[in-house]
Amino acid sequence: MRLIQNMCTIAEYPAPGNAAASDCCVGAAGRRLVKIAVVGASGVGKTALVVRFLTKRFIGDYERNAGNLYTRQVQIEGETLALQVQDTPGIQVHENSLSCSEQLNRCIRWADAVVIVFSITDYKSYELISQLHQHVQQLHLGTRLPVVVVANKADLLHIKQVDPQLGLQLASMLGCSFYEVSVSENYNDVYSAFHVLCKEVSHKQQPSSTPEKRRTSLIPRPKSPNMQDLKRRFKQALSAKVRTVTSV
């Protein structure tokens, strides 16, 4: 597995509508591109989640999250896709409202899907989910962006502040998939959360028909010859031949 870490921050992304953004569905080697942003409060394990998914390794300590972009290839239903995963700095809350920088908003607009992460050891991170989900959907008006809610640190039951069942109920109410994971102990659950998003985005990107089929459908099919008309022409030709033989 090849992993490329591009040391670029969300501030460096092309704004929606730019030429670079218009080609956002095509990745390296012409493969379809899937873009996922990982968001949530500070300290919930976003970076650990991303690195665990991409490398299968767990690293406990990280430097302050600067918003790095990671790229790899994934297999979804037999097709190789180019996947980009954007790690993001922790979201803050001021006076019961989200404080999202424009750089973070651009990252969310850039994404084809979003992972919202909270920690079962931090009730405030759980309280962010509804506001954050609403904010994500507001930045994608006119389309239903695929979102997965992930409850991290499931192994730390001795300091649990949030029952995972609450996360499941909230995710269901918001129309999102839900995964309870322990990034430090279980790779499979982490993989499943990202895989279901990649699959959903892949299905949304697939056109109803291929360009070749669409072009073919525009070409009028030749009309089938009328059988009665053919019989009439055949009789006329046969009668003419009989008259010619008789005259001779």
From Swiss-Prot:
Region (Disordered): 205-226
GO biological process: negative regulation of transforming growth factor beta receptor signaling pathway
Organism: Homo sapiens (Human)
InterPro entries hit by this protein: P-loop_NTPase, Ras-related_GTPase, Small_GTP-bd, Small_GTPase
Source domain of life: Eukaryota
Catalytic function, reaction form: GTP + H2O = GDP + phosphate + H(+)
Induction comment from the UniProt entry of this chain: By TGFB1.
Gene Ontology molecular function: G protein activity; GTP binding; transforming growth factor beta receptor binding
Swiss-Prot/TrEMBL keywords: GTP-binding, Hydrolase, Nucleotide-binding
Annotated stretches, region: Small GTPase-like: 29-246
Gene3D superfamilies with a match to the protein in the record: P-loop containing nucleotide triphosphate hydrolases
Protein name, as recorded: Ras-like protein family member 11B
Record-listed E.C. numbers: 3.6.5.2
Major enzyme class: hydrolase
Tissue and organ distribution: Widely expressed with highest levels in placenta and primary macrophages.
Similarity-based family: Belongs to the small GTPase superfamily. Ras family.
Binding site for GTP: 40-47, 87-94, 152-155
